[in-house]
Amino acid sequence: MINDIQKTAEGKMQRSVEVLKENLAKVRTGRAHTGLLDQVEVEYWGSMVPVSQVANVTLLDARTIGVKPFEGNMAAKVEKAIRDSNLGLNPAAVGDLIRVPMPMLTEERRKDLIKVVRGEAEEGRVSIRNVRRDANDHIKKLLKDKEISEDEARRGEEAVQKLTDKYIAEADKVLAAKEEDLMAV
């Protein structure tokens, strides 16, 4: 019974760390990556679709994304969608290739982004702690209903605490890597 609670808690904690990684990946650094354009949508035959469905998105170099539409007539629409995306990007069409250079981040902007990243990491840690609280509440309920002994309850809570420490450390590691990435010039 305690093992089921631990497995459930570990799965939820792992998911919290995954969500944190996904959220931090959306924060733009000075380095180019194709995932940056994932949320940019362009109109295609009357419906809005992600850029990746109407164009080939590649890295030209560490600071430039290349976007090559599958159909030549889509280049202007794709360029406009990227420009209007609120990502602070300024694409330039060169023939049928759209070059998207990554602007340099100012020191002030880097510090603002670090604050955002730290906030996201704290949300991840809170989520992990909430999973711990739920698991401990479940263990206490089993103890109250006399389904487990006090020793089993204590061991269960200690195991859940170890899981919590492990996943909070992992969240901190993810945060440190992102901060380092942001501060790299």
Curated annotation (Swiss-Prot):
Keywords: Cytoplasm, Protein biosynthesis. This is Ribosome-recycling factor. It is found in: Cytoplasm. One of its GO terms (cellular component) is cytosol. The keyword Electron transport does not apply. The keyword Cytoplasm applies. NCBIfam families: frr. Belongs to the RRF family. GO terms for biological process: cytoplasmic translational termination. GO terms for molecular function: ribosomal large subunit binding. Responsible for the release of ribosomes from messenger RNA at the termination of protein biosynthesis. May increase the efficiency of translation by recycling ribosomes from one round of translation to another.
